[in-house]
């Protein structure tokens, strides 16, 4: 197996979050950007305006769509994610679904929070 094939095999085992982190580290080390300005330029000037409008979202909102059957577990996780909430506020948030759990967080934070709440039994949407 060649050096490149071994590297491909190793990279294939990374999770999406690990791959994103690797991408950021390589961008920093090599002083490049993974953005695709070349593709926009190659597409022509007419396509440039829609591409700018469709910029990647940087801030996300985690929405609790449904508390599910295991509301107690979900309430505990909501309190873990939002320590500023008391028990009553967390309970009201879960029972009043759909509700925003957190707003203006990074994609990675939104995915981590979504995973925790989903594992607790909630139905989550990231906007």
UniProtKB/Swiss-Prot annotation:
Keywords: Ribonucleoprotein, Ribosomal protein. Disulfide bonds: none annotated. Signal peptide: none annotated. GO terms for molecular function: mRNA binding; structural constituent of ribosome. It comes from the Bacteria. HAMAP family: Ribosomal_bL12. Belongs to the bacterial ribosomal protein bL12 family. This is Large ribosomal subunit protein bL12. The lineage of its organism: Bacteria, Pseudomonadati, Pseudomonadota, Alphaproteobacteria, Caulobacterales. The gene is rplL.
